[in-house]
């Protein structure tokens, strides 16, 4: 989300 690509958001959501 934001300046980060979709993969980062997906990873963060998964690890969070």
UniProtKB/Swiss-Prot annotation:
- State a single Gene Ontology molecular function: prunasin beta-glucosidase activity
Protein keywords: Glycoprotein, Glycosidase, Hydrolase
> Which reaction(s) are listed as its catalytic activity?
(R)-prunasin + H2O = mandelonitrile + D-glucose
PTM summary from the entry reads: Glycosylated.
Superkingdom: Eukaryota
Q: What is its EC number?
A: 3.2.1.118
- Keyword Transmembrane listed? The answer is no
Transmembrane ranges, per UniProt, are none
How does the annotation summarize its subunit structure? Homodimer.
Entry protein name: Prunasin beta-glucosidase 2A
Organism the protein comes from: Prunus serotina
Q: What is the lineage of its organism?
A: Eukaryota, Viridiplantae, Streptophyta, Embryophyta, Tracheophyta
